[in-house]
């Protein structure tokens, strides 16, 4: 079973659009243990060595929701840190240190919207792993 206390989202910048913030808050109510950090830059040195680092980037690998759930479950009891850059993306030195480059879609999304989509996919993955009716494939 996938647990939110093993997951964190680290993002550059703050959400400015109210409708995106409201959407994120709706999912946060469902997943209160999910950690979301907003900062001006990434400090990858603060991420523990045995944690999994997944960078969201347009050149990353794409998964459907079932595949993403399986991937996250395969990381067993490790903590998983998702990194979302700003409009300029994630610096290449940080991408080089990641365990996985993940693309949410072949389409390009504003970084604020990417956060909302990622949070929904995390909620969906948790629902899939719990056999909840939220995901109807």
Swiss-Prot record:
<dbReference type="GO" id="GO:0005737">
    <property type="term" value="C:cytoplasm"/>
</dbReference>
<keyword id="KW-0963">Cytoplasm</keyword>
<feature type="binding site">
    <location>
        <position position="85"/>
    </location>
    <ligand>
        <name>S-adenosyl-L-methionine</name>
    </ligand>
</feature>
<dbReference type="InterPro" id="IPR029026">
    <property type="entry name" value="tRNA_m1G_MTases_N"/>
</dbReference>
<dbReference type="GO" id="GO:0070038">
    <property type="term" value="F:rRNA (pseudouridine-N3-)-methyltransferase activity"/>
</dbReference>
<keyword id="KW-0808">Transferase</keyword>
<keyword id="KW-0489">Methyltransferase</keyword>
<feature type="binding site">
    <location>
        <begin position="104"/>
        <end position="109"/>
    </location>
    <ligand>
        <name>S-adenosyl-L-methionine</name>
    </ligand>
</feature>
<feature type="binding site">
    <location>
        <position position="56"/>
    </location>
    <ligand>
        <name>S-adenosyl-L-methionine</name>
    </ligand>
</feature>
<comment type="similarity">
    <text>Belongs to the RNA methyltransferase RlmH family.</text>
</comment>
<comment type="function">
    <text>Specifically methylates the pseudouridine at position 1915 (m3Psi1915) in 23S rRNA.</text>
</comment>
<keyword id="KW-0949">S-adenosyl-L-methionine</keyword>
<protein>
    <recommendedName>
        <fullName>Ribosomal RNA large subunit methyltransferase H</fullName>
        <ecNumber>2.1.1.177</ecNumber>
    </recommendedName>
</protein>
<keyword id="KW-0698">rRNA processing</keyword>
<dbReference type="Pfam" id="PF02590">
    <property type="entry name" value="SPOUT_MTase"/>
</dbReference>
<dbReference type="InterPro" id="IPR029028">
    <property type="entry name" value="Alpha/beta_knot_MTases"/>
</dbReference>
<comment type="subunit">
    <text>Homodimer.</text>
</comment>
<dbReference type="InterPro" id="IPR003742">
    <property type="entry name" value="RlmH-like"/>
</dbReference>
